[in-house]
UniProtKB/Swiss-Prot annotation:
Signal peptide: none annotated. It catalyses: GTP + H2O = GDP + phosphate + H(+). HAMAP family: EF_Tu_B. Residues 19-26 are annotated as: G1. This is Elongation factor Tu. Residues 10-205 form the tr-type G domain. It holds the Pfam family GTP_EFTU_D2. NCBIfam families: EF-Tu (TIGR00485), PRK00049.1 (NF000766), PRK12735.1 (NF009372), PRK12736.1 (NF009373), small_GTP (TIGR00231).
Length: 396
């Protein structure tokens, strides 16, 4: 059957759920889709199992992959990512959180903030999630009003500690499970949450007037049609028929024509900043493009290997290193969707960098990545985030 056109009349925002494992992120995601579909008759109610992804990932009792769902309120259309909660899957959290104009931080009222609550707030700050709204979940399990107030204060303090406006952030108390089970008073709390999200998270200022660029998240082949690259358009606009360059990782760049654009399985004439899309590329084989590269308007961005950056090194308490590092330290640098190994050179007079410090450093990557001044990245070793930084100048 022919694909229906995507409705652009409502403003669009990308949000997601973050928080500690088992605090109820996926249940809340299911509850939002269910309550909104029930109230408006629009959108599709998603069951917990449908969001929680592939079976082998659920057997370990944790969500590994990033699930994308869509729903709408009266004023907006949302694309929602359910980010994995477990520390082993921080890598996915980083790719998921990078897709967010705002986040819903889920905290179990019964447990209060936990290590990953802190880690996800930190990650949100580092990957540039500008606004968070808090959902205190499992409030049906807490009878003590004072305890709820205490947990709320604790969450607000934690947000302030990481430069979010803890005093102003909306905090909604509710129960995702009870709402999912259709209990009216708890359904109201979901509506209250979505009203807060509508009002508190501003309509994102899109970079759609800048030149087109999209980090590649995934690549697959469609028999008879060609190769599709998926990702979130970081800036600019892409029209069917445009020429784009595939840049990064490899030394040589490749030009191609975009022969089709789709979003949520619907065809578009064009895509713009903020859209999660699949772009069909003419004459590109599956082997010629990979995650970590970018699609960009020809001549607007170049891959680089050497830059200076301002970096914050996580303290031991934040889950960072326990020991200092020195020049010639070789961690992974996580740009947009991929890790690339790089060598660190510390400025003259700085012998070593302690956990909890911030420092300037020069980085030399082993493969070129499309970066600019202001591009953010994480520093990781063995799958663990140990620092975060921003490119200050490009040297090569």
């Amino acid at each position: 059957m022919a694909k229906e056109k995507f409705d652009r009349s409502k403003t669009h925002a990308n949000i997601g759920t973050i928080g500690h494992v088992d605090h109820g992120k996926t249940t809340l995601t299911a509850a939002i889709t269910t309550v909104l579909a029930k109230r408006s008759g629009k959108g599709q109610a998603m069951a917990y199992d449908a969001i929680d992804g592939a079976p082998e990932e659920r057997e370990r009792g944790i969500t590994i992959s990033t699930a994308h769902v869509e729903y709408e309120t009266d004023s907006r259309h949302y694309a929602h990512v359910d980010c994995p909660g477990h520390a082993d899957y921080v890598k996915n959290m980083i790719t998921g959180a990078a897709q967010m104009d705002g986040g819903i931080l889920v905290v179990s009222a019964a447990d209060g903030p936990m290590p990953q609550t802190r880690e996800h707030i930190l990650l949100s700050r580092n990957v540039g999630v500008p606004y968070l709204v808090v959902f205190l979940n499992k409030c049906d399990m807490v009878d003590d009003e004072e305890l709820l107030e205490l947990v709320e204060m604790e969450v607000r303090d934690l947000l302030s500690e990481y430069d979010f406006p803890g005093d102003d952030v909306p905090v909604i108390q509710g129960s995702a499970l009870k709402a999912l089970q259709g209990e009216a008073e708890w359904e109201e709390k979901i509506i209250e949450l979505m009203n807060a999200v509508d009002e508190y998270i501003p309509t994102p200022e899109r970079d759609k007037d800048k030149p087109f660029m999209m980090p590649v998240e995934d690549v697959f082949s469609i028999t008879g049609r060609g190769t599709v690259a998926t990702g979130r358009v970081e800036r600019g606009q892409l029209n069917v028929g445009d020429t784009v360059e595939i840049l990064g990782i490899n030394e040589e760049k490749k030009s191609t024509t975009v022969t089709g654009v789709e979003m949520f399985r619907k065809l578009l004439d064009y895509a713009e900043a903020g859209d999660n899309i699949g772009a069909l590329l003419r004459g590109v084989s599956r082997e010629e493009i990979q995650r970590g590269q970018v699609l960009a308007k020809p001549g607007t961005i170049t891959p680089h290997t050497k830059f200076t950056a301002e970096v914050y090194v996580l303290s031991k308490d934040e889950g960072g290193r326990h020991t200092p590092f020195f020049s010639n330290y070789r961690p992974q640098f996580y740009f947009r969707t991929t890790d690339v190994t790089g060598v660190v050179h510390l400025p003259e007079g700085t012998e070593m960098v302690m956990p909890g410090d911030n420092t300037e450093m020069t980085v030399e990557l082993i493969a070129p990545i499309a970066i600019e001044e202001g591009t953010r990245f994480s520093i990781r070793e063995g799958g663990r985030t140990v620092g975060s930084g921003v490119v200050s100048t490009i040297t090569e």
